[in-house]
Curated annotation (Swiss-Prot):
It is found in: Mitochondrion membrane. This is NADH-ubiquinone oxidoreductase chain 6. The chain crosses the membrane at residues 1-21, 23-43, 47-67, 86-106, 133-153. It catalyses: a ubiquinone + NADH + 5 H(+)(in) = a ubiquinol + NAD(+) + 4 H(+)(out). Belongs to the complex I subunit 6 family. The keyword NAD applies. One of its GO terms (molecular function) is NADH dehydrogenase (ubiquinone) activity. The gene is MT-ND6. Core subunit of the mitochondrial membrane respiratory chain NADH dehydrogenase (Complex I) that is believed to belong to the minimal assembly required for catalysis. Complex I functions in the transfer of electrons from NADH to the respiratory chain. The immediate electron acceptor for the enzyme is believed to be ubiquinone. Its main location: mitochondrion. The lineage of its organism: Eukaryota, Metazoa, Chordata, Craniata, Vertebrata. One of its GO terms (cellular component) is mitochondrial membrane. Its EC number is 7.1.1.2. Keywords: Electron transport, Membrane, Mitochondrion, NAD, Respiratory chain, Translocase, Transmembrane, Transmembrane helix, Transport, Ubiquinone.
Length: 167
């Protein structure tokens, strides 16, 4: 239970890091930490295979996207975490999270154990279910993501040579 609280706090910090967005480099780091912590929370709930697959797919997609993103929008002097502008964004987002917690979650009953909440869901998530019912959709989703990547890269190239060029 303590590890879930630590993961939740780390996930919240990574979301604030992405929302403050000082530079594409730091936002990519915040997303990677958020993906890792989110998959760690799934692993604590007993969904080890699903968390591993989500982690690999998400980080693979982010690797491709953030390899091209800094190249397309490179800044000579990016804002770092120590700048006052980024610090003010972090303070505003933390204030909004605290207000939302007091307004919406303050009166809710917290679960004593993770098993109370995710115990019934564990049996439906497994290797056989992912590949039996959703195998074709995983394949189609992979192709759609590849085509979307190629379309975006071709649209953003302008009049220069694009990503689909003869070598």
């Amino acid at each position: 239970m303590v590890l879930m609280v630590v993961f939740s706090v780390m996930f919240l910090i990574s979301l604030i890091a992405v929302a403050s967005n000082p530079s594409p480099y730091f936002a990519a780091f915040g997303l990677m930490v958020g993906a890792g912590v989110g998959c760690g929370m799934l692993m604590q709930c007993g969904m080890t295979f699903l968390s591993m697959i989500l982690f690999l797919i998400y980080l693979g997609g982010m690797l491709v996207v953030f390899a091209y993103s800094p190249a397309l929008a490179a800044e000579p002097y990016p804002n770092a975490w120590g700048s006052w502008e980024v610090f003010s964004y972090v303070l505003v987002y933390m204030f909004l999270v605290i207000v939302a917690w007091v307004a919406f979650v303050g009166d809710m009953e917290l679960f004593d154990d993770v098993e109370e909440y995710f115990g019934a869901m564990r049996r439906y998530v497994g290797v056989a279910e992912v590949y039996n019912a959703g195998g074709y959709m995983l394949f189609i989703a992979g192709w759609v993501l590849l085509m979307a990547l190629l379309v975006v890269l071709e649209l953003t190239r302008g009049y220069s040579r694009g990503c689909l060029r003869a070598v």
